[in-house]
Amino acid sequence: MTVELEKIAGSFFISKGWKTFVHRTGLLSGQYIRFQVLTPSKINVLLFDKKKDSKLPMIPSSKKQIKTAPKRSTGITINDMPTSKHASMLISHTSNKETSSDSRTESMTDIPSSSDNSAVTPDIKNYISIIGQFLQRSSKFYIVTMNNTFMKQDRLVEAAGSDSVTMLLHKSSDDRCNLKRGWATFAATNAIHLHSVCIFHFYKAPNVKITIDVL
């Protein structure tokens, strides 16, 4: 089975082949999966259930072959894997900024503005605790805030990995940023329901794009 990995703003996403990957592995919503890229041609996959207990590791038995892929994407062939679980969670973090040339800190200029001292809400603390077991000790998180100058006018936003999904980002009179015109369809398509907790990551590449973590 072959998938393509795309790097956007310091995070990796499966841009092609994800539906087939889910079908072949039997992944289910609400459970967790960890991808560990050891070399450009080798990938390990670890599985966790809802209680974060480790399942059987999905470790490939041979080297993976790199396939030709579009710019900023990597094609990786993955062997057949046993039934496992899935969490559609996009992790945005960075390694030590002094040693990692691919870290998110290298892309901070592409973000409208950022703050290392933003207040961390209980929901974000819980989110970090859930995925903390997957991260290296040097990993750092950045909470992105919107620059007032950037938000003087409404902005068109594209969903990462899809040029056809666009929404309108609007700043209300009480300084809240809202996604309008296209959000309802996007939420319904991606099973985002009332009371869902979402973390939004905005960046420019060169247009404003977004990834959404649903907790």
Swiss-Prot record:
Alphabetized InterPro entries for the sequence: B3_DNA-bd, DNA-bd_pseudobarrel_sf, Plant_B3_domain
GO MF annotations, alphabetized: DNA binding
DNA-binding region: 1-51, 123-215
Span list, region Disordered: 92-117
Superkingdom as given in the UniProt entry: Eukaryota
GO (cellular component) term, any one: nucleus
Location of this chain's protein in the cell: Nucleus
Basic and acidic residues bias spans: 95-107
TM regions (residue ranges): none
Predominant location category: nucleus
Listed SUPFAM superfamilies: DNA-binding pseudobarrel domain
Composition skew (Polar residues), residue ranges: 108-117
Keywords: DNA-binding, Nucleus, Repeat, Transcription, Transcription regulation
Protein's UniProt name: Putative B3 domain-containing protein Os11g0625400
Organism encoding this protein: Oryza sativa subsp. japonica (Rice)
